[in-house]
Every structure is written in structure tokens, then in C-alpha cells.
Design a protein with these regions (language model features):
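Blade-level signature of beta-propeller repeat domains, shared across WD40, Kelch, NHL, RCC1
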Residues: 360-390
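Short loop/turn segments immediately following beta-strands, especially the blade-tip
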Residues: 288-294, 382-387
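Beta-propeller domains
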Residues: 89, 93-113
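A short loop-to-beta-strand structural motif that recurs across blades of beta-propeller domains
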Residues: 103-105, 144-146, 231-233, 284-286, ...
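Blade/loop signatures of beta-propeller domains
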Residues: 33-70, 389
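Blade-edge beta-strand/turn elements of extracellular beta-propeller
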Residues: 65-77, 113-120, 148-163, 231-250, ...
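N-terminal export signals
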Residues: 1-18
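Beta-rich, blade/repeat-based domains predominating
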Residues: 77-92, 120-139, 144, 162-182, ...
């Protein structure tokens, strides 16, 4: 029995020696992103693996808009509060604002660099380019909307409604009929983004703040005291200014944009602003039918809730398919951009390491999504195009 057992053991050892070795388990890593520890390094010379871990596909349809071989890139940093990007197809540059830094910048496409453009900028906030390539800007400090003509001159489009000074025009879009539509919340009616009211005004009830101190343009302060509720306005080329959405309908309007066919107007309602007596907006996005010079059929487009997190919207743009790309002011991991279909379905998002205020499509093909996020400018190459103009 002992000899037979030894022989059997030898056979088993031989069989084990001939058995193929098992393959070791695959070893894969987790690419750094905005939410890993350590987090992603956004400085130059630190490329991301493809597909970019901060470009998140929620619905398969998003893959047709967000290619797997493109990365989100930080183009520049150095702002205090970056806002209002708009693309000039004639000049091949992106203009954007540093609201609290009181400076406008240009990102030059060919040079791939950011340079100062206007300083002081009158705390310019939102910008756009009209159908003739002229820059439209909302000035928080002067509480007005202006247009820069091709000869370099400045035209004031609107600084009052029915003789009362505007609050602080915030975002602006042109219409093919030559009209200009803009929002007028109160966010620039404070010291860091523009100037507070004169003594006794809603944003300076005790009169302790001095609006003109240290302001290089104090002599042309517009809107001494807040006199109007928040609203959305339409300026007609004839010079007529109409209030098309009231504060009762939609408090604290902020970002706005048209659908590609100009049949729908989207408006963001953000939170309570300085001097507001009401509760402010709910940080939601609403849609309106455009009927000539008026709007109708107000409806909720999205409440901007994701995983129980309120992704507070600020600015937005539509692409040629009618998708809405909306900025997200939310905690890390949800800050960035959310993409919705025209039916209001969330299909994808882009995470950024900073809160995103506004965005615009640009580049020669108008396929680059530029994102103004707090102190930085980011860009991502898509496979769609922005609905022109910027």
C-alpha cells in the first residue's frame, strides 16, 4: 500500500507540473480626476488619459457630442470671477470678463494665449456678438447695456426703463430681427461686482458704503439707487425697450439663450440677490415660446437636481441640435457643465475643479466649448457646433 501511495503522489505531482499556470489578475489603475485623491493635475504638461475621466456619459446619445479622444484643458488661470465668454468669428478670439477683477480679456485662437483687452471694464459681466459681429456687453458698474461699433465707438443700448435706472444687466443675446434680449438681476449692485446703491438704497440702507471710493469711473456711475424689480428685457432697433418677463413671473433672471430656430427662449432663475425683498429664484431653468416680440407658455425645463445635489445654473448655450449646455455652480464633483436634450433629458456632464459661471462655443469650427469657471478658462473639443452667433 505504501509503494502504491508514493507512486500515486508522484503521478499527481507530475500532473501539477504539466498544468498551465493561472494568469495573474489584470492590473488597471484609476485615472486621476476632479474627485480622486490625489486629484487631477490641471497644469500644462499633465495630459489626461482618454476618454477624459471628467467627461461623464449619462445617456449613450452623449457620445455623439463628446468624443472619447478629447480632453478638458485649462487654458488660463488668473481671474477673480470669470464670466461672459463670447466668440468673435471675425476676429478669431474669445472675449470674456473678469467681473470682480474689472477687466475684459481675449483668448487669441492662433496664439493660444489670453491677453488683457479692456481695463477697467466697468465690471462687465455678460457678453455676446450680434449678427454683424459687434460686441454686446452688460456693465455692472454703470448698470447698462452697451454695443461696441466697428469703428471702436461705444453706443449705450439701455440704461433705464421708463426713466428708472436698470439694476445690473447680466447676460445678453441677439435675435436675427436686430433686437437684443437681456436679463436685469441685482447681482452687480454690490461693492465687489459693481457698486452699491447710494445711501438709503436697497443695497446700502444705512449709507455706510461709499459707491465712488476707489472707482476710476466713479463720475459716470449709472443707477444711483435700485428702483426696478428684476426682469428680462427686449430692446428693439427702433430704440424701444420692453419688459417681456416680469419678476412676478420669474425672479432674479440670469443666463439666457435662444433655441437654434429662435422659437424658444430659455432663462435661468437664480437665487436671492442684493436688495431683494422676496425669496429670489429657485435656481432652475425655464422655457418660453417666442411669439414675435413677446413670450408665452412658461414652463420648467429643468430643476438642475442631480443625485440629490442642486447644480445651480448661471449661464448656458445651445448647440445646433438644440441641446442645452448649462453651467453648474455646485460642490466639487458636480461643479462644471450639464448637457440636456431639447426635451430636458440630462445626457452628460463635464466636471471641473472650479465652479462654472458661463460658457460659449467657439473656435474656427465653433466646436470648442469654452467654460469660464471662477478663476480659470477651460476648453473642450466637442463633435457638435454652437448655435451662432456667440
Amino acid at each position: 500500500a505504501g509503494g502504491a501511495g508514493l507512486a500515486a503522489a508522484a503521478v499527481m505531482r507530475g500532473a501539477e507540473a504539466q498544468a498551465p499556470a493561472s494568469n495573474p489578475p489584470a492590473q488597471t489603475g484609476t485615472p486621476p480626476s476632479t474627485i480622486t485623491n490625489p486629484p487631477r493635475d490641471w497644469s500644462a504638461g499633465h495630459p489626461s488619459i482618454y476618454p477624459d475621466p471628467d467627461v461623464l456619459v449619462i445617456d449613450p446619445s452623449f457620445r455623439s457630442l463628446a468624443p472619447g479622444n478629447a480632453a478638458v484643458r485649462r487654458v488660463w488661470t488668473g481671474a477673480q470671477w470669470a464670466e461672459g465668454p463670447a466668440w468673435s468669428s471675425q476676429g478669431q478670439y474669445l472675449v470674456f470678463s473678469d467681473v470682480t477683477g474689472n477687466t475684459q480679456y481675449r483668448y487669441l485662437w492662433d496664439a493660444d494665449m489670453v491677453v488683457p483687452f479692456r481695463k477697467p471694464s466697468n465690471n462687465t459681466n455678460g457678453n455676446s456678438l450680434d449678427f454683424e459681429g459687434r460686441q454686446l456687453s452688460c456693465e455692472d458698474f454703470n448698470r447698462r447695456v452697451v454695443r461696441w461699433e466697428h469703428d471702436g465707438s461705444l453706443r449705450v443700448i439701455a440704461d433705464n426703463f421708463d426713466g428708472k435706472g436698470l439694476n445690473s444687466p447680466n447676460d445678453i443675446v441677439p435675435h436675427p430681427d436686430g433686437s437684443i434680449w437681456f436679463t436685469d438681476p441685482p447681482y452687480g449692485d454690490r461693492l465687489n461686482e459693481g457698486h452699491p446703491d447710494e445711501a438709503g438704497g436697497p443695497t446700502n440702507p444705512q449709507g455706510l458704503l461709499k459707491p465712488g471710493v476707489g472707482a476710476p469711473n466713479a463720475g459716470v456711475i449709472g443707477g444711483k439707487k435700485r428702483e426696478l424689480p428684476t426682469a428680462v428685457y427686449r430692446w428693439d432697433p427702433s430704440g424701444k425697450l420692453e419688459q417681456i418677463i416680469t419678476e412676478t413671473q420669474l425672479p432674479d433672471p440670469n443666463g439666457l439663450c435662444f433655441s437654434p430656430d429662435y422659437k424658444t427662449l430659455y432663462v435661468i432663475s437664480t437665487g436671492q440677490g442684493p436688495g431683494d425683498t422676496g425669496p429670489g429664484g429657485k435656481r432652475e431653468v425655464y422655457a418660453f415660446d417666442v411669439e414675435g416680440t413677446k413670450v408665452a407658455n412658461m414652463r420648467l425645463f429643468t430643476d438642475m437636481m442631480l443625485d440629490g445635489v442642486k447644480c445651480g445654473p448661471d449661464g448656458m448655450r445651445a448647440d445646433v441640435y438644440g441641446n442645452l449646455w448649462i453651467s453648474s455652480n455646485a460642490p466639487l464633483g458636480y461643479a462644471g457643465v450639464l448637457c440636456f436634450t431639447k426635451e430636458g433629458k440630462l445626457i452628460g456632464r463635464i466636471r471641473l475643479p472650479e465652479v462654472c459661471a458661463n460658457l460659449a462655443f467657439g473656435g474656427p469650427k465653433r466646436d470648442r466649448l469654452f467654460m469660464c469657471a471662477s478663476t480659470s478658462l477651460f476648453v473642450y473639443q466637442t463633435t457638435t457646433q454652437g448655435a451662432a452667433p456667440g
